[in-house]
């Protein structure tokens, strides 16, 4: 005796396109779920008899229907459109850079973030690894699709993926923080104080708030928008026709032309930087868009970064070379990576970290002494690192359930149905209960209470954000 129920959730604003399939085969219940058009994840359970299996299946189906899922015909909706950055990478003829260590992530790597204690790398296989600054592997997350980029927003670390979801990596288990509309062919994203900016293939920039609710979207004069940088001043958007600054409400503040299409963007406190297809890195003042620096490379620039406040400017081209410039535009050096072309990069404490076309996270010694030695053929002993057998912690909607919260143990929040949305508010003493809480979307259940490690006020002071672990209270 077998029966299958297939459901889909497709929100009117394009925020979610997911499926949920429940199959009952005698005493076994198999649940498959995920993004429409993808294979999804599978969970199975066996029950004492067919009646108990049916009852369990009906309960799961009922839960999803209450969340807005509805019966559908499998295969009618198609997978979201995905564009992946392609670099025809050639071997550099420059002198080899002083590489201290190189980690093999296993697939072309796009995502990178270098924090105070850890380095993060995300690749096309959906693997996100954490390492110490000396290259020791400390953790591994598994995401359902290829990683587009990794971004930091104060304490919070996020990974944007080809499945259209943005995952919060700040706890032991990855959780869905944002779901990007199905019609957005994502190129890049950035987050500031919970506000997410997304640039896409069509050249649009789209902004959503901490509740993952649409705020505004603006079509660009160009296409292929590989740059979006969110800041207190608004959003800086780079595409085939240059760089445009929009205020926080979506009004155009200024536009600056570039020599070539923008392929990458970086920002510092007072300036934004745009790497282009014609071998330039342009520096623009955030205040008015004036070009205050121009840095010339020998091939298309697919990544760039700076030291604090732009004292030094770094760039990576599609010929497996990296460059360093002084702020005034003087080229200080050009060296070979030895591990492909850099999809992205970040500088920290005289080290330049790259993620590359061959899947490496490479750490270069960018100190003047090390560079001078490399130019004379004296290189450090490079350490080659592999992941080994470290466990892969998968993204999940499952939450540990506890019976109660001990006095002083964390903060209690509650999910409340408000109109067509499920909001979250703090119920513990000492907090403003009218404020919303930024909280993972796919674990919200109306009426449920959760225990979170910590709740902090957003930088803008209008909502709360959770930090640490999340447990559901029974």
Model-assigned labels for residue ranges:
Residues 339-387:
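Blade-level signature of beta-propeller repeat domains, shared across WD40, Kelch, NHL, RCC1
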């Amino acid at each position: 005796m077998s029966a299958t129920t297939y459901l889909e959730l497709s929100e009117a604003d394009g925020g979610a396109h997911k499926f949920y399939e429940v199959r009952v085969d005698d005493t076994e219940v198999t649940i498959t779920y995920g993004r429409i058009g993808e294979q999804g994840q599978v969970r199975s359970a066996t029950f004492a008899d067919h009646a108990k299996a049916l009852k369990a299946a009906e309960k799961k189906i009922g839960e999803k229907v209450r969340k807005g899922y509805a019966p559908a015909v499998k295969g009618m909706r198609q997978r979201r459109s995905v564009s992946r950055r392609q670099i025809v990478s050639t071997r550099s003829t420059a002198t080899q850079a002083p590489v201290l260590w190189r980690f093999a992530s296993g697939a072309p790597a796009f995502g990178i973030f270098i924090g105070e204690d850890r380095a993060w790398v995300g690749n096309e296989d959906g693997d996100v690894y954490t390492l110490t600054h000396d290259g020791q592997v400390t953790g591994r997350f598994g995401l359902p699709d290829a990683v587009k980029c990794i971004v930091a927003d104060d304490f919070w670390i996020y990974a944007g993926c080809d499945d259209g979801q943005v995952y919060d990596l700040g706890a032991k288990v990855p959780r869905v923080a944002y779901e990007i509309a199905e019609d957005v062919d994502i190129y890049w994203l950035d987050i500031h104080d919970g506000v997410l900016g997304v640039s896409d293939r069509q050249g649009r920039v789209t902004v959503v708030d901490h509740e993952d609710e649409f705020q505004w979207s603006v079509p660009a004069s160009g296409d292929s928008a590989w740059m979006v940088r969110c800041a207190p001043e608004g959003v800086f958007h780079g595409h085939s026709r240059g760089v445009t600054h929009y205020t926080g409400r979506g009004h155009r503040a200024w536009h600056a032309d570039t020599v070539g299409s923008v392929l990458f963007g970086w920002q510092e406190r007072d300036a934004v930087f745009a790497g282009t297809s014609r071998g330039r890195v342009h520096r623009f003042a955030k205040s008015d868009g004036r070009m205050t620096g121009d840095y010339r490379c020998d091939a298309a620039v697919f990544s760039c970064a700076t030291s604090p406040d732009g004292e030094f400017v770094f760039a990576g081209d599609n010929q497996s070379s990296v460059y360093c410039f002084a702020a005034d535009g003087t080229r200080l050096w050009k060296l070979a990576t030895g591990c492909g072309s850099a999809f992205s990069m970040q500088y920290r404490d005289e080290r330049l970290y790259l993620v590359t076309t061959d899947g490496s996270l490479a750490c270069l010694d960018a100190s003047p002494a090390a560079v001078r030695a490399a130019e004379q053929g004296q290189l450090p002993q490079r350490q080659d690192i592999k992941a080994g057998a470290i466990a892969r912690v998968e993204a999940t909607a499952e939450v540990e359930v506890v019976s109660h919260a001990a006095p002083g143990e964390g903060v209690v929040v509650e999910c409340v149905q408000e109109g067509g949305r499920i909001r979250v508010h703090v119920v513990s003493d000492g907090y403003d209960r009218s404020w919303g809480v930024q909280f993972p979307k796919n674990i919200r259940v109306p009426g449920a209470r959760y225990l979170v490690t910590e709740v902090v006020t957003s930088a803008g002071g209008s909502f709360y954000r959770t930090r640490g672990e999340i447990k559901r209270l029974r």
